[in-house]
Structure formats: structure tokens, C-alpha cells
């Protein structure tokens, strides 16, 4: 989950001080979703699944690929990863992409969102330093395999795995030098793949990369926005007319509810939205930062020139939104006696909590930060419609993780009831938002496969329980993958325009044959049984 990159640090802090209960999400019947199916969405609405290169591909040292910052980080600081793992093999999509596409086809999905590994096609990060033809060939093969199976590729250009060479050369997104290098990298992708790729996402979750991945979040976000705008300008000038594609950016956001009816807590909730969502949406729509950020951050917030503002305004055909959870927001009063160094999180003057008056905002998933609040996605969509002139939107990530319970049989574990409930309720509220005029054009479940989840690694080991977030179980220790029966049938039937019975989704039972895939990790040679 991309959001885990942002909230992982907070989760670690929470888990260090509070015992984490090994209870899974308990579905609650809040709304009648029994009539929800594919026809509940507009004609042409896209359903798909998502992934990212470092979390999926593996083959870290194959095919001429250069090192990314995540290769360096996981090897140099393995103690920072909960299971001390890395993405060297990941779920081996580099070798097994045909198998994965076959699963997508079985699920009757329309599209697949994946990211290109910048260092796989530009090992040194710069076009002038050499293009890796093997990397180009891999993505051509993946794109062609998707199209041959009736799946639409949605391609993200940057999903956290920056070339280490650029980090070493000028500190990555903390330098304005990256703007031209990103533009050149994007142009290479447009040239090589744009005849078949019609949906481009420049950057995934700039908020996450800025606040957790760098030491100077305001500078990093500034350069990410300008790199995005430069790539969009180039695409629109040189490629969009002939290639007939669209381009946008993906932003992550939590929905924030006021902790109380106090006006200060209501202001805190709005301020939290400004600092997480408005930080990027305001420049993209108005060419400037939210006033709350300007007032609280002051001179530490880089200013856009008039030329930059003009380039930023409207630099998207669509906005991708990654939504997982919601939180209560309480005001933190200003203190004149605070002489400590300012930080992004302190600048907000907001205390975020998932509990109010002893009651959680919703059932908790496996991750300490992920509390299930489906209505939040509707509220966020309506907020975006009202505040930002109703842009075209794709839900580019939405999903949950849950604990593996070692007491369950394989058949019971594959039922995946809670994830079905999570998806169904979020789809219900998305459908409701569409009926209220929000222009949502597609939905991508996170994730196709259990995968390397950044600081959580492949598993979150808590009392010998492991968390999973994919529609396919990927067991690294046993080197196998298994389709989760009920969730696979749910997706397959839903996408066929089927209904899931007359009662709540939590009462549905299906029996799907289990597909087991084994990988010889020593040789990375996949076998499908």
C-alpha cells in the first residue's frame, strides 16, 4: 500500500508503545449493498488492480537494471524493515508477468496499473548516461501481454524507486536538477510506449515521498510538482495529439473528521486536508499553496514564480486518489514557548487519532494505522468535487490488509471475507458519490498480489501473525502463491455484472479452485501448476 509509506513510521511508534491485538476486521452491516454490481457504475467505468515496480518486479540485479534508493536502503539498513527483507525478488513479476496477466484476465478486470522502474530503463537516471534496451524490452512485453488479453495499461512513471545515481549526484528531489531529468525520462517512456499506453500517471503520492522519503518535505514537494508539470507540458506539446492519451498525477489522502464539535477541531480537520491534499491540489488548480500552509510554514515554503504557477495550473487530465482510511483531527494550540525545530507534522497544529471517547473510527485492519471507514471515500470525493472544480478522478489505490490466522485451514484462509466486505462498501460509497455528480472514471484495488510493503516488508510479524493485502496470497517462505477463493470469485462475478446474492456481502460463500504457483528462488524460474 502506498499509504503505508506515509503512515508506516507512525505505525511503528504506535506498536512500540501499545500492544497490537491480533483481531481482524469485523464487518458491520451499515448499508444495503446487495444490489451493487458492475451496472451500478457508468458505462466505460474501469475496474482494475494496482502494483508498483519495486514491490512486484524483483530481478533487482538482472537485465541491466541500475540500483534504486530502495535497493540501497533495504540492503544498507535492513534493520529498518520489519522482517529485514528487500525487493530483490519481490513477487517476481519480471519473470512471471504472463502468469499475473492470466490471473487478471480470470478476474475479468479491465485494466492494470503498474509503474516503470526508472533505474531499469535508465540505470544512471539520465538519458545522456545510457538507455537500457533490456528494460525497454521488458515493459514492451508486459504492455503487449496486457493488450493481447484485453487489459488497459495505466502506467506510473515514479513510484518511490528513484535511481540511486541521482540521489548520489544531487540528492534526488531535493534538487531542481531532477526536473529536467524526470522530464527526459518521461519523454523516453512516451516515445517507447505511448503508441499503446493511453493513461499516464507522472508521480505516485508526492506527499508520501516528501514527508517520509526526504529531509526537506517542502522542497521535495516543490520539485515533484514542477517535475510533474514539466512532463505534462512536454506530453501535451509533443505527444498527446498523435498518441491520443491522457496524463495525471496520483495523490494520497485520508478523510479527516473533527474530533469534536468545537470550531477549532473543525478548522483542524480542514487544515489537515490542506496539508495533505491541498498541498498539491491547490498548486495544480490555482498555482499557489493553501493559505493555511502559507500562514503556518512561512518562508520555509518555496514560492512559485508566475511562469511556474502558469505551468502548474490545469496540468492534469485526471487526478488519481489513493484512499485507505480516515482519522479524527483535533486542534493543537499554538505555543509561544515551543523553541524546538519546526517540522512538517508540527506545522499542521493537528493531532490525529483513530479513537474518540474510547470508540475507534471503524474496525481495525492488520496495520495499526488502517481503520476501516468506507464513508470517508465518499466524503473525500464530494470535497474534491466542490473545492477543486469537479476533476476527472480515478481511485488508483484502495484496499486493506489483514492478519493471517495460523489456526485457520487453507480453505478458511482463502475465503477472504473481510477484504470482500471492505471492497464492496467502498465501491458502494464511490457509486453514491458518482450519483452526486463526482466524475469518478475507474477503480483500482490494491493490490493484485501480496507484496513487499515498504518498511513492513512482506509480513508484519506480530505474535506470529502476518498481514496480507493482495487478492493473491504470496508466501515467501514457502515460495508459493495461492488465489484467495472468495475474493477472486467476488471480483470475477462482480466484473461480469453479476450480483452477490440478496443479503449482505459478508454472508456470501464461494468455492473456487486454488491455483498454486511455486518459484525456485535460487534460479528465479517460475513454474505454474
Feature map (PLM): residue ranges:
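Active-site region of glycoside hydrolase catalytic domains
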Residues: 4-11, 15-81, 106, 124-127, ...
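Active-site mouth loops of central-metabolism enzymes
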Residues: 82-95
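Glycine-rich ATP phosphate-binding loop
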Residues: 465-480
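Conserved N-lobe beta3->alphaC-helix segment of eukaryotic protein kinase catalytic domains
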Residues: 478-498
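Intrinsically disordered, low-complexity segments enriched in serine/proline and basic residues
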Residues: 506-517, 521-529
Amino acid at each position: 500500500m502506498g499509504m503505508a509509506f506515509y503512515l508506516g513510521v507512525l505505525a511503528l511508534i504506535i506498536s512500540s508503545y501499545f500492544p497490537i491485538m491480533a483481531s481482524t476486521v469485523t464487518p458491520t452491516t451499515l448499508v444495503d449493498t446487495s444490489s451493487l454490481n458492475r451496472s451500478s457504475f457508468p458505462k466505460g467505468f474501469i475496474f482494475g488492480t494496482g502494483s508498483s515496480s519495486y514491490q512486484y518486479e524483483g530481478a533487482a540485479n538482472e537485465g541491466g537494471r541500475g540500483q534504486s534508493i530502495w535497493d540501497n536502503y533495504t540492503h544498507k539498513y535492513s534493520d529498518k524493515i520489519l522482517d529485514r527483507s528487500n525487493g530483490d525478488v519481490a513477487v517476481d513479476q519480471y519473470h512471471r508477468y504472463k502468469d499475473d496477466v492470466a490471473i487478471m484476465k480470470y478476474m475479468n478486470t479491465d485494466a492494470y496499473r503498474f509503474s516503470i522502474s526508472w533505474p531499469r530503463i535508465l540505470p544512471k537516471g539520465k538519458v545522456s548516461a545510457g538507455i537500457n534496451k533490456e528494460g525497454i524490452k521488458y515493459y514492451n512485453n508486459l504492455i503487449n501481454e496486457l493488450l493481447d488479453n484485453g487489459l488497459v495499461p495505466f502506467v506510473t512513471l515514479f513510484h518511490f524507486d528513484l535511481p540511486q545515481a541521482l540521489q548520489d549526484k544531487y540528492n534526488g528531489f531535493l534538487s531542481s536538477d531532477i526536473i529536467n531529468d524526470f522530464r527526459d525520462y518521461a519523454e523516453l517512456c512516451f516515445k517507447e510506449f505511448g503508441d499503446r499506453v493511453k493513461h499516464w500517471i507522472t508521480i505516485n503520492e508526492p506527499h508520501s515521498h516528501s514527508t517520509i522519503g526526504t529531509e526537506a518535505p517542502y522542497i521535495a514537494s516543490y520539485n515533484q510538482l514542477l517535475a510533474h508539470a514539466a512532463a505534462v507540458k512536454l506530453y501535451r506539446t509533443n505527444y498527446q495529439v498523435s498518441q491520443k492519451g491522457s496524463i495525471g498525477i496520483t495523490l494520497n489522502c485520508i478523510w479527516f473528521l473533527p474530533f469534536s464539535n468545537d470550531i477549532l477541531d473543525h478548522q483542524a480537520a480542514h487544515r489537515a486536508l490542506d496539508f495533505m491534499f491541498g498541498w498539491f491540489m491547490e498548486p495544480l488548480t490555482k498555482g499557489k499553496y493553501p493559505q493555511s500552509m502559507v500562514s503556518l510554514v512561512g518562508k520555509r515554503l518555496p514560492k512559485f514564480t508566475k511562469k511556474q504557477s502558469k505551468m502548474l495550473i490545469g496540468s492534469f487530465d485526471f487526478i488519481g486518489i489513493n484512499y485507505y482510511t480516515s482519522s479524527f483531527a483535533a486542534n493543537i494550540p499554538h505555543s509561544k514557548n515551543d523553541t524546538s525545530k519546526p517540522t512538517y507534522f508540527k506545522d499542521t497544529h493537528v493531532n490525529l487519532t483513530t479513537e474518540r471517547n474510547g470508540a475507534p473510527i471503524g474496525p481495525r485492519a492488520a496495520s495499526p494505522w488502517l481503520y476501516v471507514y468506507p464513508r470517508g471515500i465518499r466524503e473525500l470525493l464530494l470535497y474534491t468535487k466542490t473545492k477543486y472544480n469537479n476533476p476527472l478522478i480515478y481511485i488508483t489505490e484502495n484496499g486493506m490488509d489483514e492478519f493471517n490466522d495460523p489456526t485457520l485451514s487453507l480453505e478458511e484462509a482463502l475465503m477472504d471475507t473481510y477484504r470482500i466486505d471492505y471492497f464492496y462498501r467502498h465501491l458502494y460509497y464511490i457509486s453514491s458519490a458518482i450519483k452526486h455528480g463526482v466524475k469518478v472514471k475507474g477503480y483500482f484495488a490494491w493490490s493484485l498480489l501480496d507484496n513487499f510493503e515498504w518498511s513492513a516488508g512482506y509480513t508484519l510479524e506480530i505474535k506470529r501473525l502476518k498481514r496480507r493485502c493482495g487478492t493473491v496470497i504470496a508466501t515467501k517462505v514457502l515460495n508459493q502463491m495461492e488465489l484467495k477463493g472468495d475474493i477472486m470469485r467476488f471480483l470475477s462475478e462482480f466484473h461480469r455484472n453479476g450480483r452477490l446474492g440478496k443479503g449482505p456481502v459478508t454472508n456470501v460463500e464461494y468455492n473456487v479452485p486454488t491455483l498454486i504457483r511455486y518459484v525456485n528462488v535460487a534460479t528465479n524460474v517460475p513454474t505454474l501448476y
